[in-house]
Amino acid sequence: MHTLRKHANIQREDTELKLALIGALAAVLLAPAVHAGETLDRVNSTKVLKVATNAGWPPQSFLDDSNQLVGFDIDVANEIAKRLGATAEFDTPEWGVMTGGRWGGRWDVAVGSITPTKPRSEVLDFAGIYYYTPYVFAVHKDSTLTDPKELNGKRIGVETATTSEEYVNRSLVIDAPGVPPVEYWLEPGEVKTYADSMLPFDDLRLGDGVRVDAVISGEQTVLGAINNGYPIKILSGEYAFQEPLAIVADKGDAEWTSKLGETIAAMKADGTLSQLTTKWYGKDYSE
């Protein structure tokens, strides 16, 4: 009797285990179908596009005198939303949070001039390149330096958790077709990092060599600072590197990423991106 009961218990446990394994396998197989296109469905339903961007990065995105977000990235995001039949709703998370992925539905897209790099590709999906920027070396207007190669051994300022920091640390790997490999020749004496894109320029404007000798940043950002009265200039000569910028989605929704990619391609084809880069930067950076 005990032997039969024990055998029956073993059979029941074995059956329950098999059913549990079948259920788990079914959940795994069905999960992509459940979540595929989830973001696009939500945007179509709510008519709202939740956009992550920056609040202090002129002329890409910044607060104007009326405390309203304006800039190139804001115009691009609004145009994407318009073409999707939605209205853009902006949020300005910390840079590392925005580029760290695992958004948990907080945002549908990031329009923040984000470079497609190998580490970011593990947690984000790149929908498409929408413009390019050369990274340049900015110095105080009173600096006697004339060539970027003279910056070896100098104090260099960069924004933290950006491609500028990766460049000075020689760890930058850009994950985009057609972009030449980064050449590392700069050997800074000291690297100073800052939590915001404009803070390095705030130190540089204090005087030649007062806190930093140079800042590495995108050409558009440097020109924006010059236009806003910062007493700085760009060293002529070679760029630090050429950077493609991508529209970004959270990892895992291929249908949504594809839809964004189609929208970006259409904006490039009809000249919208050319017009917007010219509007904000004075030249066409869309190609």
Regions found by a protein language model. Name each.
Residues G37-E38, I74-R83, D142-L145, K149-T163, ...:
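Extended ligand-binding regions for polar small-molecule ligands
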Residues N78, K82, T87-E150, K233, ...:
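Acidic, polar ligand-binding/catalytic clefts
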